[in-house]
Amino acid sequence: MKLNELKAALAAHPDLNLRFLLPNGVAVPEHAHVTEVARIDKRFVDCGGKLRADALCRLQTWVADDLHHRLVAGKLLGILTKAAAILQSEDLEVDIEHEAGWISQFPVESVAAVNGELVFRLGVRHTACLAEDQCMRPPPGLKDFKLSTLEFKPIAK
């Protein structure tokens, strides 16, 4: 989800409490805080040697001991408005950083008003080759190769 889409959902429901649903369907405790809004810039070289750049907006959550805390959509919208100078774009993808045993980042797949809450459905990221045309591919015929056809010989010492 893009930042501009997220902000529109927040603006449309400013009084609703936020709820974050992890990809496994487990909800982040409702008293979670959004403790950080960041622009993450990544510059890297892919496996084919091509220089690449990527940027996203990351919202960090934190579950504190104050069980009565609730974050409403309007407050998060205000925080995002204050962060506009560092975000520099509303076209950034948004992800949520959350710690549940370890720190993980989840892309925001959708936001919808459900049963009086603004529910963020979080997804998962997968790795992929960014330069498939440059990667080594097996020669024709080798793709059907079976390891069981190999003859193993002991290595001489």
PLM features per residue range, with description:
Residues 4-36:
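Small/polar-rich, solvent-exposed N-terminal microdomains that initiate assembly or binding
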Residues 27-51:
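Short, solvent-exposed beta-alpha or beta-beta edge segments that form flexible loop/patches at the rim
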Residues 29-31, 52-56, 89-91:
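Short connector loops at helix/strand junctions that flank enzyme active sites
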Residues 41-49, 63-64, 80-83:
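Short secondary-structure capping micro-motifs at structural edges
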Residues 53-67, 122-124:
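Oligomerization/assembly interface segments of phage tail-like spikes and tubes
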Residues 67-73:
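Short, conserved charged micro-motifs
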Residues 78-134:
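Helix-rich interaction surfaces within compact, conserved domain-sized segments
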Residues 122-157:
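Mixed-charge, glycine-accented linear interaction segment located at domain edges/termini
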